[in-house]
């Protein structure tokens, strides 16, 4: 049994709880399924400084399968929070010594915020209105550069067009 096509992202809101990752890994190993870690990704969702996130991953022994989330509730996302942290995460993902594999931004419900997130280079968007994202992806500025993820995509590989 290879675990099928199911993937899981352990999304942890507090850096101090990095031991959840090591405990999860140890439990799979002790149950005789260490290979299932190939299906597990990691995310610290507490909006901490990217450098501090990296330190927590090092403590947990994480060397890959890192999704970095950034975001806030949709009602204040763009005009209070901005995309500075997401841009830092994208820069880390794109650097030769970065630890991030994917960057996703949430919660994006407006056309303008969707465009801003895509322009920042995020890999994914969480939304309450998928039609908004689909419509933006069909615009000439985005249709050659981005696409909707498919069943066959590897969630740990950065999509390059």
UniProtKB/Swiss-Prot annotation:
| Keywords carried by this UniProt record | Cytolysis, Dermonecrotic toxin, Disulfide bond, Hemolysis, Lipid degradation, Lipid metabolism, Lyase, Magnesium, Metal-binding, Secreted, Toxin
What InterPro entries does the record tag this protein with? PLC-like_Pdiesterase_TIM-brl
UniProt KW Hydrolase keyword: no
Localization in the cell: Secreted
The free-text note explaining how the cofactor binds reads: Binds 1 Mg(2+) ion per subunit.
Task: Tell me which tissues or organs this protein is expressed in.
Answer: Expressed by the venom gland.
Entry comment on modification after translation? Contains 2 disulfide bonds.
Recorded superkingdom: Eukaryota
Q: Does the keyword Transferase apply?
A: no
UniProt cofactor(s): Mg(2+)
Q: What is its EC number?
A: 4.6.1.-
Q: Which GO terms describe its biological process?
A: killing of cells of another organism; lipid catabolic process
Q: Name one GO molecular function term.
A: toxin activity
Pfam annotation, one family? GDPD_2
Q: Name one GO cellular component term.
A: extracellular region
**Catalytic reactions of this protein:** an N-(acyl)-sphingosylphosphocholine = an N-(acyl)-sphingosyl-1,3-cyclic phosphate + choline; an N-(acyl)-sphingosylphosphoethanolamine = an N-(acyl)-sphingosyl-1,3-cyclic phosphate + ethanolamine; a 1-acyl-sn-glycero-3-phosphocholine = a 1-acyl-sn-glycero-2,3-cyclic phosphate + choline; a 1-acyl-sn-glycero-3-phosphoethanolamine = a 1-acyl-sn-glycero-2,3-cyclic phosphate + ethanolamine
Family membership noted in the UniProt record? Belongs to the arthropod phospholipase D family. Class II subfamily.
Protein task: Dermonecrotic toxins cleave the phosphodiester linkage between the phosphate and headgroup of certain phospholipids (sphingolipid and lysolipid substrates), forming an alcohol (often choline) and a cyclic phosphate. This toxin acts on sphingomyelin (SM). It may also act on ceramide phosphoethanolamine (CPE), lysophosphatidylcholine (LPC) and lysophosphatidylethanolamine (LPE), but not on lysophosphatidylserine (LPS), and lysophosphatidylglycerol (LPG). It acts by transphosphatidylation, releasing exclusively cyclic phosphate products as second products.
Q: What is this protein called?
A: Dermonecrotic toxin LarSicTox-alphaI-1
């Amino acid at each position: 049994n290879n675990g099928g096509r199911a993937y899981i992202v352990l999304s942890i809101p507090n850096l101090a709880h990095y031991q959840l990752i090591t405990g999860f890994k140890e439990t799979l190993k002790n149950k005789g399924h260490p290979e299932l870690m190939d299906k597990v990704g990691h995310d610290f969702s507490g909006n901490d400084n990217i450098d501090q996130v990296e330190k927590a991953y090092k403590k947990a022994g994480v060397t890959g399968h890192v999704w970095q989330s950034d975001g806030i509730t949709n009602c204040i996302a763009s005009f209070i929070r901005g995309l500075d942290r997401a841009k830092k995460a994208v820069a880390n993902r794109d650097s030769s010594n970065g630890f991030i594999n994917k960057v996703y931004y949430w919660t994006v419900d407006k056309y303008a915020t969707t465009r801003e997130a895509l322009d920042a280079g995020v890999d994914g968007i969480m939304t309450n209105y998928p039609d908004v994202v689909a419509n933006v992806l069909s615009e000439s500025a985005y249709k050659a550069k981005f696409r909707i993820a498919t069943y066959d995509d590897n969630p740990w590989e950065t999509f390059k067009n």
